[in-house]
Amino acid sequence: RPVNVMGATKQIAERIILHLQEEYPNTSFGAVRFGNVLGSSGSVIPLFKRQLENGEPLTLTDQDVTRYFMTIPEAVQLILKASILDSFPGQVAMLDMGEPIKILDLARNLLRLSGRQFRMGENVIVTGLRPGEKMHEELAAPDETVHATEERRVFLVETPEEFSEIPYGLRVSLGNADGLALLDFLVAEFGAAENQPSALKELGATLTMSGSKMEQEA
């Protein structure tokens, strides 16, 4: 369940891929869902390592925040193993990443490995959750069904959503070279969500107002 624009665009990408399988059945299309890839650009461990090297406190958004992690080899294996599954075309695959990891525990272990003592409020500080950031990640939505495959750690996610309207809306926006309309379209689907973060609501409202202003000026 996306709560920010990045999550929304990822879900839209999944829908496009699955729609392509319906439109071009002679070609195999499928998508994979990643967890947080350790060591990748923007991930928490490179951030913590940089802060340690600079003598800075480790920053985390909340003491209770958790995340699922996978290594780069696991990410590669997920793509390769999913791609050879007979049941993969037209599906979304994800990896069994075990239990989510508490970021506070990750910070504590990195400090210990670097020979430093853990001192909350001194070398570890809490900055607060950012707009659109989740406390805990969900690998699958409540209305999705997860199925096992012949690959022990690879699962397929079945979603009840219909995909036909998404590609059509994207085609209209892209065909008109209208970036505002495209973003507005992406955000609008989540406008009715009760727990939608204010940042996403504000972006949707801003895009709508900007689009209306452009129409008036034209």
Briefly describe each language-model feature range.
Residues 6:
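Catalytic tyrosine of NAD(P)H-dependent dehydrogenase/reductases that use a Tyr as the general acid/base
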Residues 12:
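Active-site His/Glu-centered metal-binding helix of metallohydrolases
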Residues 15-218:
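Strand-loop microenvironment adjacent to phosphate/nucleotide-handling motifs in alpha/beta enzyme folds
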Residues 9:
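Active-site helix of classical SDR
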